[in-house]
């Protein structure tokens, strides 16, 4: 282990197997905080490679508590966080809306580390039980088309890294890992990343991890599909990665200012999203969610982004997404 750490300190890259060994030790609490901090910063400064990310993800998935994986097609939609935008929880709202459009979503999330409100902070504010047993979460996925999997419930090893992550107050490989270690192991994923430099490496990592189809996005300094700036996309399909750019017009939408998506505390975000999911939200909010839902639906084989956007907006305006949230909360 010391040889791996020393190699990292010298700015070297490590193999997938070495990364799996390193992160296996991390989640077993075998590294001192100083060693962990130094390793994470060493990788951050020179940039993380896809083999290293895949090795780390494999270590955490191997250690995860089991989830009864369905045999039907389902997805995750999740962002790394750490983009500094403090926006409303677009991916969480998108997951709920997408479920009403026929896309089953098992969303993996956590409490906030570096922003105002993570997905789990928001869900707790809605009264949704974060420690729902795996069998009940699977039942919700079957019957409601959506479930939320709280990372610490399935990845106890995260606790060993959390104090160091909070102390560093910056994005590290752990921010990148969160979207890749969904214990349900979805075959499809829409993943937002906090830096454009991560778009292709994460897509390559998804290919190594065996995803059927996925899209990795970064738009205008946000880990989402953006409407205020071009969105950079790396789409994985049948082992091939295609890079392209999307603009608001591709969704049949008008551009919206980034400031319009500013969020706040979990309670404030809950109120914003409650209005949105009841069909009473702000135009910029529903447009942002609809665009992200549209790209997610594309991964399910619904290729027309404009049609998908229209469908998502109809679902939002119906108010049905809010009823879905309340139904999930009632399963407490």
UniProtKB/Swiss-Prot annotation:
Enzyme class: transferase
Residues the entry annotates as binding anthranilate 1: 79, 110
Binding of 5-phospho-alpha-D-ribose 1-diphosphate, residues: 79, 82-83, 87, 89-92, 107-115, 119
Cofactor(s) in the UniProt record: Mg(2+)
Pfam families referenced in this protein's UniProt entry, alphabetically: Glycos_trans_3N (PF02885), Glycos_transf_3 (PF00591)
Assembly and interaction partners: Homodimer.
PANTHER family per UniProt: ANTHRANILATE PHOSPHORIBOSYLTRANSFERASE
Protein's recorded name: Anthranilate phosphoribosyltransferase
